[in-house]
Curated annotation (Swiss-Prot):
Residues in the signal sequence: none
InterPro entries for this protein: AAA+_ATPase, DNA_recomb/repair_RecA, DNA_recomb/repair_RecA_CS, P-loop_NTPase, RecA-like_C, RecA-like_N, RecA_ATP-bd, RecA_C_sf
Residues given in the record as ATP binding sites: G66, P67, E68, S69, S70, G71, K72, T73
Organism ancestry: Bacteria, Pseudomonadati, Pseudomonadota, Betaproteobacteria, Rhodocyclales
MF GO annotations: ATP binding; ATP hydrolysis activity; ATP-dependent DNA damage sensor activity; damaged DNA binding; single-stranded DNA binding
Xref: NCBIfam families: tigrfam_recA
Gene encoding the protein: recA
Name of protein: Protein RecA
Pfam families from the UniProt entry: RecA (PF00154), RecA_C (PF21096)
Keywords, in A-Z order: ATP-binding, Cytoplasm, DNA damage, DNA recombination, DNA repair, DNA-binding, Nucleotide-binding, SOS response
Function: Can catalyze the hydrolysis of ATP in the presence of single-stranded DNA, the ATP-dependent uptake of single-stranded DNA by duplex DNA, and the ATP-dependent hybridization of homologous single-stranded DNAs. It interacts with LexA causing its activation and leading to its autocatalytic cleavage.
Subcellular location, record wording: Cytoplasm
C-alpha cells in the first residue's frame, strides 16, 4: 500500500474509533483478538468431538431442533450443568411453561442458582433475553422454545384471526438486536425449536422449523436431534438411543454425527459413550458380550461395563483421553470461561 493510501486508511480508522469507540474496527492479526474459541461442553463426549471445537461456542447463537421427546431440553440442561460447573451464570426462559426442576436437578443443574423466567408473550421473552445478554453477567441463556414465543397481537386477538408472518417478523427483529450484544458479552444463547411439516412438498424433506428463516441464518451451530431407539433392561424401557447431526457449523466442518444414550432420570450416559467409542477406536476390546480394557475384563454386557466405569472414574478418564487423541480432533477443553472465572 502506498503512503497516501496508508495515511487515508489510518485517518479513517482513527475517525471510526473516535466515533464508535476503541475496538470497533481492527486488523485480524492484532494481538487483542482472542484466537481461541471459548466453548462449553455439551455433556456428550461424542457430540463435543463432532462439533470440532470441543463443545458449543460462546458468544454465538445455537439452535437445537427435533421431534417431540427427542431429548432437546435434556441436552440443553446438560449444557447448563456444564456451564455451572465452570462457575458460570445460567438463565432458562421457559416459554412452554414445562420445566421440571426435579428433573433438571437430576441432570446436575444447580436449580438454586438457575435464573428462570416464564413469560406471557414472545416479545416479553425476547426482551428479557436481550436485557440479560446486555447485562454481561449471564454466561448461557436457553429459550424453550421458539414455537412457544407467541406474539402479543396473537394472544390479544380472537381465535381464528389471521396473523400471517407475525412470528417470523418477531424472531427476525429480535435476532437483529441480540446478535451484536451476544458477541460483545460472550454469551451462549440456545434456542430450542420444534419441527413442522410443509404441505404439498413432492421432493426433498417436508420438515421445517418454526419461526421463519432468520434463526437459520443467525445460528452459528444448528443441531438436529432424533430418538433412534429404546434402551431396555428386561422389558422395562430405561432410556433412549439418540442421534445428533451437526446440520450447520460456522466454527468447524459440519455434517458430523454423534450417537449416545439418554437414560431416564440420569441424562446423557457418559460412561456408555466411553464404552461404545472405546470399542470403535480399538481401545476397549469386545469379545461376545464381554468388554475388556488392557486385558482385564470390565463387564459382561454394556450395562455392567458402564457400571464398572462409573465405579472406576480414573479408568474412564484414561479411556476418554485415548478416545480424544484417537479422534485426532483439535478439541479445546471447555475451561476458557473468562467471565465465569472472574465470578
Amino acid at each position: 500500500m502506498d503512503d497516501n493510501k496508508a495515511k487515508a486508511l489510518a485517518a479513517a480508522l482513527q475517525q471510526i474509533e473516535k466515533q464508535f469507540g476503541k475496538g470497533s474496527i481492527m486488523k485480524m492479526g492484532d494481538a487483542e483478538i482472542d484466537e481461541g474459541i471459548q466453548v462449553v461442553s455439551t455433556g456428550s463426549l461424542g457430540l463435543d468431538i463432532a462439533l470440532g471445537v470441543g463443545g458449543l461456542p460462546r458468544g454465538r447463537v445455537v439452535e437445537i431442533y427435533g421431534p417431540e421427546s427427542s431429548g432437546k431440553t435434556t441436552l440443553c440442561l446438560q449444557v447448563v450443568a456444564e456451564m455451572q460447573k465452570l462457575g458460570g451464570v445460567a438463565a432458562f426462559i421457559d416459554a412452554e411453561h414445562a420445566l421440571d426442576p426435579q428433573y433438571a436437578q437430576k441432570l446436575g443443574v444447580n436449580v438454586g442458582d438457575l435464573l428462570i423466567s416464564q413469560p406471557d408473550t414472545g416479545e416479553q421473552a425476547l426482551e428479557i433475553a436481550d436485557m440479560l445478554v446486555r447485562s454481561g453477567s449471564v454466561d448461557i441463556i436457553v429459550v424453550d422454545s421458539v414455537a412457544a414465543l407467541t406474539p402479543r397481537a396473537e394472544i390479544e386477538g380472537e381465535m381464528g384471526d389471521q396473523m400471517v408472518g407475525l412470528h417470523a417478523r418477531l424472531m427476525s427483529q429480535a435476532l437483529r438486536k441480540l446478535t451484536a450484544n451476544i458477541k460483545k458479552t460472550n454469551t451462549l444463547v440456545i434456542f430450542i425449536n420444534q419441527i413442522r411439516m410443509k404441505i404439498g412438498v413432492m421432493f426433498g424433506s417436508p420438515e421445517t422449523t418454526t419461526g421463519g428463516n432468520a434463526l437459520k441464518f443467525y445460528a452459528s451451530v444448528r443441531l438436529d436431534i432424533r430418538r433412534i431407539g429404546a434402551i431396555k433392561k428386561g422389558d422395562e424401557v430405561i432410556g433412549s438411543e439418540t442421534k445428533v447431526k451437526v446440520v450447520k457449523n460456522k466454527v468447524a466442518p459440519p455434517f458430523r454425527e454423534a450417537i449416545f444414550d439418554i437414560l431416564y432420570g440420569e441424562g446423557i450416559s457418559r460412561q456408555g459413550e466411553i464404552v461404545e467409542m472405546g470399542v470403535a477406536h480399538k481401545l476397549v476390546d469386545k469379545s461376545g458380550a464381554w468388554y475388556a480394557y488392557k486385558g482385564e475384563k470390565i463387564g459382561q454386557g454394556k450395562d455392567n461395563a458402564r457400571e464398572f466405569l462409573k465405579a472406576n472414574p480414573e479408568i474412564a478418564q484414561e479411556i476418554e483421553a485415548g478416545i480424544r487423541e484417537a479422534a485426532s480432533t483439535n478439541v479445546i477443553k471447555p475451561v476458557k470461561a473468562a467471565k465465569a472465572a472472574d465470578a
